[in-house]
């Protein structure tokens, strides 16, 4: 019934077509019995690598298990195809910048690129057997997703959780957009710590160490610790900034670290978050000398020129009033920098170039005391890798800081798998210092459903789109009752996380029970049962999703969250195109097949990074081959699609294998209910190799072939083989869907092994404690016999004239049925239970002593 060799390419093609046609994975909207999975939508950002398969397989193991358990599984796939990652891919593909081609043309280019990338993802997911219901596919830039994302924003704004404000934010000078705190990564760079001479009005020299001397023109104060005896006499005096000659106050603040640098710190607007804190706490002026391109712009020292408002629709003198930021107006002009002769030297330079130039000027003027080479951590944009600047601009924010306690309660209410990952989220939430900036100065994203009024008497008023009219594009559409001349459309787009943070709601087609699309299914699938994702986006995707569900419905978005680790390259680093360490999935799939790739993915524990290992693929291939060969052997003793009956299983060792299998079903079911797929596979695999193949198939062979005269024992063997293999296939099915389907079809049924309610139930088996203990004793004795033969270079098949066994306890002696199988598998003419033995070929394990009488001549 089974071919000589398993041809994975033919089988995979066959069942991919069959599964799609039969809709075996389709959700049937069965209320009350649905298991909903919030699937991570892959980002459309570049070429695929083996890591893309890694965690998606983990989710599929659970989806297939739950389906076989009897659940109506809601298993969608989405594509996160809007936002900065997609824009960067398009810019790289066409070797252009978004602003060079214009909004409309660039958006067209984005749609072209994402369509091709989506097809590549689809082919990959199908080729590895991911059991999505493709009719539930969604896209974060689709009309429905944009409508829901805009609904989410409107709901948050109306509830007071979304707001717009001019304030210092993290700015990416490469992608020219604001970014959120969660999109930062710390990188270590080589730099220099420069000790610079300032002066006081009394002409007293003071020394300040800094890694950013290019910010000297932005210096607005000098700080010392109030208890630093070296500098207490300076508090309240005026410092003269090196090179620029600007006069700034010397202020005491306990956030200064006495043991860092010289103990004196210059506050520049803005070098880091501490500068923001000091500027706002002490009411200092702002001197913004870096523009949105990452260049020195001394003309913009007031922070009010057009370049600082570029891309936001806001400029000085526009009809939209400036919001109250609590920032004191400038008292200095930029004249000191001009007068000091550095204006022409550094104006227009990139930050790094300006730093080098300033150091040269300081050296020439004798104001650089010391320059020490150091390595230090710099905050960079996660996407572009560029060092970030802090610039004051108008942005949209979602409140996070005032709801930290409530969000932490939600985090603790959710079940985390593994539990250790919950702590990672708690640490992140507790350490938050910024509200979530959700606006981006880009093109390809969800537009804010907002206009700003120019109508007389309501200048600057925010006009929200009506929910029933969503989705809208404020650049093309008008608010009800307003003319084009009376409004300014908001030109920003939402952070891509602002949309992907509502993936449970995108699947439900509603933001909450009161706000959704007409055809919503919110009451059927929200909250979801499971969110699966990798650990590096806990602080983004997991956090933002919990936050939004809390705001929209005071609910968890899902009951369980399952966290995968990374698939690391051979160099133990995360796979990435830029590092040149990616492994193409298509090559691996062509070499080993989908089941082996899935086996590799299943051999990683939740939350643990796994180094790519070719050896695991080889082990997986060996397992697939063994499963095929074992099935071929069993097929010799059964009719195709024969009925299975446990009632005719009568022999001790047959009951032993059933009892072992009973415990495996119990363990693997519990493992998978806790999302521990790795532990489940390990238990199945151990049973298959050790109990079934190494021991049971060997001991039952002769009885199955009918060598024995006992027809009842022969029938017991055949039924046991067919029965056990059937359950083995169903246990392996979530992990190895192709080979199990083929064997199941050929031997057992035309129905799919993956059908609902086809997971093995331990009630299908008989647990016989006596037979299990008897069988375990049997295996111990068999292993001792094998050891003696191996140690003495005697063939396993070599005839034993007499097998003598001493049991430490009389009750451990085998019964007639088991002893008969032992005699067959050991090829022994006689088995004798003895009180003592002095044979030459002997070994023992504490429970049994075994000796052999063999003619080796």
Q: Which residues fall in each region the model found?
A:
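Structured ligand/cofactor/substrate-binding pocket environments in proteins
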Residues: 51-63, 71, 79-80, 145-148, ...
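Secondary-structure transition/capping motifs at alpha-helix termini
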Residues: 64-72, 93-103, 123, 127-132, ...
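N-terminal, positively charged nucleic-acid-binding surface of large information/translation enzymes
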Residues: 1-227, 251, 268-281, 285-301, ...
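Active-site-adjacent bridging/hinge elements
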Residues: 31-39, 61, 94-98, 122-129, ...
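Short Cys/His-rich metal-coordination motifs, predominantly Zn2+-binding knuckles/fingers
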Residues: 175, 244, 384-385, 454-459, ...
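Feature 926 captures the class I aminoacyl-tRNA synthetase adenylation module centered on the KMSKS loop
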Residues: 195, 340, 432-498, 502, ...
């Amino acid at each position: 019934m089974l071919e000589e060799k398993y041809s994975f390419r033919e089988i995979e093609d066959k069942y991919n077509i069959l599964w799609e046609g039969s809709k075996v994975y389709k959700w049937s909207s069965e209320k009350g019995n649905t298991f909903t999975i919030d699937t991570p939508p892959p980002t459309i950002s570049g070429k695929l690598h083996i890591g893309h398969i890694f965690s998606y397989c983990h989710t599929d193991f659970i989806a297939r298990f739950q389906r076989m358990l009897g659940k109506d599984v809601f298993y969608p796939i989405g594509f996160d195809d809007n936002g900065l990652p997609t824009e960067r891919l398009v810019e790289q593909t066409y070797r252009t910048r978004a602003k060079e081609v214009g909004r409309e043309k660039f958006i067209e280019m984005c749609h072209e690129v994402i369509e091709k990338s989506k097809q590549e993802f689809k082919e990959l997911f199908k080729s590895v057997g991911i059991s999505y219901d493709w009719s539930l596919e969604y896209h974060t830039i689709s009309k429905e997703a944009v409508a829901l994302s805009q609904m989410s924003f409107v709901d948050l704004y109306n509830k007071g959780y979304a707001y717009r404000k001019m304030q210092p934010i993290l700015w990416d000078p490469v992608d020219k957009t604001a970014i959120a705190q969660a999109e930062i990564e710390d990188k270590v760079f080589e730099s220099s710590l420069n000790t610079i001479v300032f002066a006081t009005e009394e002409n007293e020299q003071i020394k300040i160490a800094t890694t950013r001397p290019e910010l000297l023109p932005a210096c607005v104060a000098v700080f010392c610790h109030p208890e630093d005896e070296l500098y207490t006499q300076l508090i309240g005096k005026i410092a003269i900034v090196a090179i620029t000659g600007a006069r700034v106050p010397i202020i005491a603040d306990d956030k200064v670290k006495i043991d860092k640098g010289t103990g004196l710190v210059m506050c520049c607007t803005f070098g880091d978050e501490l500068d923001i804190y000091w500027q706002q706490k002490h009411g200092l002026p702002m001197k913004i000398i870096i523009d949105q391109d990452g260049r020195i712009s001394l003309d913009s020292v007031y922070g009010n020129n057009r370049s600082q408002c570029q891309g936001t629709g806001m400029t000085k003198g526009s009809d939209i009033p400036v919001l109250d930021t609590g920032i004191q107006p400038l008292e200095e002009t930029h004249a000191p920098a001009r007068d000091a002769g550095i204006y022409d030297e550094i104006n227009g330079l990139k930050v790094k170039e300006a730093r080098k130039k300033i150091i040269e000027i300081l050296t020439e003027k004798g104001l650089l005391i010391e320059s020490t080479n150091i390595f230090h951590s710099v905050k960079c944009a996660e996407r572009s890798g560029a060092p970030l600047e802090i610039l004051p601009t108008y942005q949209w924010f979602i409140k996070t800081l005032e709801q930290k306690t409530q969000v932490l309660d939600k985090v603790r209410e959710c079940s985390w798998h593994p539990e250790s990952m919950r702590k990672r989220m708690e640490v992140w939430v507790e350490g938050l210092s910024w509200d979530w900036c959700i606006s981006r100065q880009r093109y390809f994203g969800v537009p804010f459903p907002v206009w700003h009024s120019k109508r007389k008497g309501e200048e600057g008023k925010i006009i929200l789109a009506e929910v029933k009219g969503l989705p809208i594009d404020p650049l093309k559409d008008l608010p009800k009752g307003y003319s084009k001349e009376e409004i300014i459309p908001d030109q920003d787009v939402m952070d891509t996380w602002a949309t992907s943070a509502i993936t449970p709601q995108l699947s439900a087609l509603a933001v909450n029970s009161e706000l959704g699309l007409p055809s919503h299914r919110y009451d059927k699938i929200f909250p979801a049962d499971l969110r699966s994702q990798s650990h590096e986006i806990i602080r983004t995707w997991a956090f933002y999703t919990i936050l939004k569900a809390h705001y929209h419905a005071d609910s968890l978005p899902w009951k369980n969250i399952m966290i995968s680790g990374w698939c690391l390259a051979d160099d133990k680093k995360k796979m990435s195109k830029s590092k040149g360490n990616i492994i193409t999935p298509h090559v691996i799939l062509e070499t080993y097949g989908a089941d082996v790739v899935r086996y590799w993915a299943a051999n990683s524990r939740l939350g643990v990074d796994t180094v790519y290992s070719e050896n695991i693929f080889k082990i997986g291939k060996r397992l697939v081959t063994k499963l095929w060969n074992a099935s071929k052997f069993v097929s010799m003793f059964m009719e195709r699609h024969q009925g299975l009956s446990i009632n005719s299983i009568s022999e001790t060792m047959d009951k032993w294998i059933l009892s072992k299998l009973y415990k495996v079903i119990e363990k693997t079911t519990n493992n998978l209910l806790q999302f521990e797929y790795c532990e489940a596979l390990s238990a199945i695999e151990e049973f298959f190799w050790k109990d079934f193949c190494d021991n049971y198939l060997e001991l039952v062979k002769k009885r199955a072939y009918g060598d024995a005269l006992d027809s009842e024992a022969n029938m017991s063997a055949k039924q046991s083989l067919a029965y056990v293999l059937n359950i083995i296939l169903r246990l392996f099915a979530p992990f190895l869907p192709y080979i199990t389907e083929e064997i199941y079809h050929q031997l057992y049924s035309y129905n799919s092994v993956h059908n609902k309610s086809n997971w093995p139930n331990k009630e299908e088996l008989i647990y016989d404690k006596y037979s299990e203990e008897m069988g375990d004793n049997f295996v111990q004795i068999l292993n001792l016999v094998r050891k003696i033969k191996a140690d003495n270079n005697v063939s396993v098949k070599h005839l034993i004239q007499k097998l003598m066994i001493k049991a430490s306890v009389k009750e451990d002696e085998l019964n007639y049925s088991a002893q008969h199988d032992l005699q067959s598998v050991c090829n022994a003419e006689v088995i004798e239970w003895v009180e003592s033995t002095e044979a030459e070929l002997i070994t023992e394990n504490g429970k049994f002593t075994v000796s052999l009488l063999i003619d080796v001549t």
